[in-house]
């Protein structure tokens, strides 16, 4: 919490006035990230090309620039803390479910629009896409020198190609 207080230009005591525990601070930060990503998704300028639109949407969830890297760092810290902290566990499950439902919607839309490979299992593919994005976030945050933004994008595009049987 000390480093957050320093970066915010506040005393540790002032920060603790608002957030008694580090978990409260992380939950608040995660809520802000969730709101930012939701706003960014709503403001996306869709192209009319379903494939490009899917790429644009999924790209909002991985660390491709400084803003998304910072959001990814918050997500990773929050999820790591939620594993052992029951006070924020319910919120972490809500965040997880919200992401999964988004991926399920993407994959379902691909099937409805005839973009998906013929024998695609919608629920399994949504879980696979969710796991891929989570993994790209973890590696993009913890080892950015080994998995650059360009490589993250390449992995996503390759995976979408497989889903679309291209």
Where are these regions (language model features)?
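A surface-exposed regulatory interaction patch that couples sensing to output
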Residues: 64-72, 106-117
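A conserved beta-strand->loop->alpha-helix hinge within the catalytic CA
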Residues: 3, 49-53, 121
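Hydrophobic/aromatic-rich alpha-helical bundle segments in the mid-to-C-terminal region
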Residues: 87-93, 97, 111-163
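Amphipathic alpha-helical segments used for helix-helix packing
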Residues: 53, 66-90
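Alpha-helical structural segments
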Residues: 7, 24-44, 52-63, 94-101, ...
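Helix-turn-helix
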Residues: 1-24, 28
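Short alpha-helical scaffolding segments that buttress acidic/His motifs in well-ordered protein cores
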Residues: 57-61, 75-79, 129, 133-136
């Amino acid at each position: 919490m000390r480093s957050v207080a320093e970066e915010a230009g506040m005393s540790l005591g002032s920060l603790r006035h608002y957030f008694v525990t580090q978990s409260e601070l992380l939950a608040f930060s995660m809520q802000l990230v969730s709101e930012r990503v939701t706003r960014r998704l709503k403001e996306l300028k869709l192209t009319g090309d379903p494939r490009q639109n899917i790429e644009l949407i999924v790209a909002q969830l991985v660390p491709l620039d400084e803003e998304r890297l910072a959001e990814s760092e918050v997500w990773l810290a929050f999820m790591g803390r939620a594993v052992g902290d029951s006070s924020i566990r319910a919120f972490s499950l809500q965040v997880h479910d919200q992401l999964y439902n988004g991926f399920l919607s993407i994959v379902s839309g691909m099937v409805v629009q005839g973009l998906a490979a013929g024998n695609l299992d919608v629920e399994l593919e949504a879980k696979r896409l969710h796991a891929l994005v989570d993994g790209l976030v973890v590696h993009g945050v913890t080892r950015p020198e080994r998995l650059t933004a360009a490589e993250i994008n390449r992995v996503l595009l390759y995976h979408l190609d497989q889903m679309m049987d291209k």
